[in-house]
Amino acid sequence: QRISIFRPDIEKIKSFSHPKISLSNFKWEKRKIKIGYLEGNHFKIVVRDIDKKDAISISNKIRKSNFFPNYFGSQRFGRLGNNPKVGKMLLKKQFEKALIEIANDSPPRVKERIEDYLSKNPKDFLGALKRLPRKNLLIIVNSVQSKIFNEILERALDEGLDFTKKGQENCILVGYKTNFYDGNLGIIEQDILKENDLTLQDFNLQEIPFLRMKGGYRKALVEAKDLSVEVAEDEEFSGSKKIILEFTLPSGVYATTFLNNFFDFPTPEQ
């Protein structure tokens, strides 16, 4: 990971020591690293305890892989997969219900903040929500967009839509300014939104302005670049193989989504 340190203490950096972290490739820059600057991520991943036959077939499948569906990974939906449910409550202005769910899944200090505010302002659930970290609330509402994106993409692929065609490489990230696509894709988009019991205007949450979502687009299919795959003896599991993968993905694309095409990993609920 590339990081930036504002006005660094050079001596402290020189003496930095941690058993699992090393610092290298130092250089001065005029600006700090911010959201939006990232071009992509390079991954090196080891998957262990694989049967020899499976290791060969899986590695061959990975080498032949091309584009894959750009689904949001399960981590987007929270530790228990609960974020879209809470996000929908916020969009539907069910502020008390949303606050209860957030409090139940929050550390003690956040619960105390909520309880302290409500003790002084009974029934002001909206006010209590506004005192929570913006980033946390944004993640919750963004998860609704992500869930809808995944459902649209999955149904579109099931119905044989071709996302390699020019002008049809994206799926919507729904918001109050969304323009649905023409044809079958647009029908799917509107059907999925209706099935989630949501409208475009639900995303125009005036009560919490920083949660208003205009909408956007996201690539439907992406490619893993700089891909290398190696099968080797697994030194930790006698008699088994390990697969060592290296690949680069664009910003915002999940390594777990790529890997799920080849490996049966447990979900957070499991």
Name what the model sees in each region.
Residues 257:
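Classical protein tyrosine phosphatase
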Residues 1-246, 250, 260-270:
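Extended, charged/glycine-rich binding lobes that contact polyanionic ligands
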